[in-house]
């Protein structure tokens, strides 16, 4: 639609004026991703407050051929929620759709709207004695709609799975305004094609997720957290298997961090204490949890059972020469101090440099091989690049990130593209994935064409054309009808 005033006037037919933003300064925070890599432009940002308003917008967009870019908390890392620079898009922010429509203790589920902040869902469930385990560094800003759109992972995937695994049902608004109600909390529903999972991870390119039914779990009442030094990734993988067996498969987190990353974290955040000195080659942050309150209380010998389990595991690791050093959190303050190291890792690398960030996954058995290959390939391109990888070892998801040499490097910006290619070359050697939990967005569209099975890519193109024949739903993301 060429006439801006006419377009805005049309939006006012089903949205309040206060829910339509066109001022450039007011729109600015929504037009750039949090890392400052992607910046776009838009005609307006709209903030619907109901599924009915989203439906009206989607009908209006189809009639007038308006590009729609859905956005949640704008915490994405691949530019999936940022429009292009044509200025032809309207950003659809779900941030004002925050109702919790249903909470069922009997069914262990809650039905929530797409704009609900993840951390607020944690609190809501815990206040009622249940647990929503999806846990990301961006939990204070990201929305459940965005988590679903990207099939987000996080630190608890090893026990509870990705967002897809936590979702029971969806409400989705299709282009043209039809509302598809798959919003059932049923645990079993074998009535035809699994359309729900088609939209999870589709990044708003097939329809707009407006609400979801999500699984809840028994609230963990006892935890034991340790930070452990290991010589290499292969040893860490071995320890994961041992901890799963020792704890009765109750490992909630198993996070890998190399010494190069840790040096940057402690440099950029000097108030965070360094618990292991000298720094080992790798540290693993590991946590086990129990829903049994007695596991966190002194037994007849005065010992805490869950801490005893962790201590016995650590002792076995020391005896086997697999663990070089370790610290065990004895209270919630110490636990948070250990988690602060991991949770500050993304911001630390951002402060230190303009990082080359990746989100790859490989089988656990290939993690060491991939790490070594990628490091070798990277140093062929840029010998002084620092590998600041971290990730969720339990599910094979590694953020193999790079930063420039300490003190800066004038060639860094020029070589970023070649560094990405070096990492992806190593990834191809171990049959890994270029996206584990961040999605494709606009950053990885071309890479996807090069690595996806051609038949699968053709099927994806057909599905996209079916739901969005004119290519106006989050254009330029994941795949387009022109591919």
Question: Over which residues does each language-model region extend?
Answer:
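Noncatalytic alpha-helical scaffold of FAD-dependent oxidoreductases
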Residues: 1-483
